[in-house]
Amino acid sequence: MKSRSLIRVFAALAVLVSLGGCASLSKSECMNANWEDIGIRDGANGRPEEYLIQHSTACAKVNVAPDRGAYLHGREQGLERFCVPHRAYQMGEYGNGFDVGICRNFDQERLQVAYEKGREVHQRSSDLSSIDSEIHDINVRLEDKDKEHPLTKKERDQLMFRLGVLTVERVNAQKAYDQARYEARDL
C-alpha cells in the first residue's frame, strides 16, 4: 500500500516537472516576439514546421498568438543555413540525427550523402576511442603493483598479447578514420 502511494507521488512530480519545463518560449519572449526572427532561429536549428505548435501553446498562456506567416517566412530563411552539406556532415560527425525531410526545397540527396559521411567519421572516431580505452585499461592492469593480487605470468602474457592485437587494430582504425575524413573533404 505504501509503495503505491509513493509511485503516485513520483508520477505526479514527473508530470509537474514535465509540464513546467516544456515551454518553448518564455512569457517575455511571447510578449515581445518577432515571429520572423523566431522562425529564422528555428529553421537554422532544423526544427520542423510543427514546432510552431509548441510556441502557440507556450504563448497561449499569455494570450499571444504567433504570426504564422512571419514565422514560416523566417523559418525558410533559417533553413537556408541548416540545409547545407557542411551542416548535415557536422550533425553526423557529432552523432546527432539529421532529418533530411525538413529540407524539402534543397538537394536532399546531397545532404544525405554529407550526413552519412559525417556518421562514418563519427563511427570511426568511436572505434578509436573504444580501442584507446581498452589499451589504457590493459596498461593500468600491467602497471598495477598490487602485492595481494599480482598478475600471474599467464595473465601478464595474455594481456601483452591483447595489447599487441589492439595496437594493430588501432593503426587500422586510425587509417579508417583518416580515410573517412579524407573522403568528406569536398563537402
Regions inferred by a protein language model and the residue ranges of each:
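Intrinsic-disorder/low-complexity detector
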Residues: 22-187
